[in-house]
Amino acid sequence: MSKRTPAVFFFVALAFMAFGAAAAFSQQPVLTPQNSNTNQLLIAVSPVDENVVWAVGTGSVFVVTTDGGNTWRTGVVPTLNAGDVQLRDVQGVSDEVAYVLSIGNLTGDFAIYKTTDGGTTWTQQFQNQLIGAFYDCFAFWTPTNGIAHSDSVNGVFPDLITTDGMTWQSIANNMPPALSGEASFSSSGTCVATQGSGNAWIATGGSSIARILATTDGGNTWAAYDTPLASGPIAGGFSVAFRDATNGILGGGSLTTGTAVDQAQAATSHDGGQTWQLTNNPPVAYAIFCVSYLSNTTGVGGGGQHDGRSQAKRSPTDYTRYAVITADIGGAAWTPDEGTTWYALSGVTGYWAVAFANPQNGWMVGTNGTILKVSFP
């Protein structure tokens, strides 16, 4: 990404277990399909609040709503080769301001764009010139301070930082040395998570060890920590989220052909990413593409690993340790306790990404433009 008589204790334990299971089941979310007005695959989603949400996908397409998803407006970012370019990550800042990250077959297809007028026009802020670079994801601490992460090139991560929301500078010299073949996965735009004023975590795979790269000072210095997730050319950590500076969850696994449940893996950390422990097996049949807490305290805007600025309505339920995972064709699930127990979302399949503004307002996006609103009681 473990007195009273024994008989009395056993039955009391069973009673508490049954109550806990019933209570958790009663918290099953309400799932509401929404019409995105596109048939393109949607890969990443970023709620700003309960009303404003941005999502992006193939064909350089973006969609945005300002009414909580009742209506969605579609558009195309004018990328270098729009038909062949995919938008793999998005950071919503407001109904007018958003950033997107593009990838493609050409070196220059990897780029960052920004709009300040709701998607009417877009400005290219960065265009890749490094052969072999593959920018998987980005995340922001503030509306103008963010980090973009790439697969390694010749043992170096050519990562980028912006401190003004306009220009991007290399921090390759700050990054820890890469393992042979070390890379990340652009499955949902959540391979990097930000928190507070300078904390960030990057999930990797592709090599002999799946690692977390971590910084506490905005990318000036980094440490690398091993995780127990499987790793290999198509295996590792895909998605990472932190609910505060200490507690986080990591999702991933293997993309090998088949439907074995053990292809999906999740792990948690309670020391800022230094050590990780596998959770119980998630009930999905494919590598976890995305993991998101219901109440985020990281970054700017909602968007998976970014901070929802709106407040959830008052609820007797403590959602602190709740998280939702998506696994494309393998299904989706949620946990109320960071992976000790899991509940499958029956019939939910084909979704790549999930993100929450608050527990009552979350969105999944995926194949054929599908959007599903996720609302916990």
Model feature map: region roles:
Residues 2-10:
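Bacterial N-terminal signal peptides that target proteins for export
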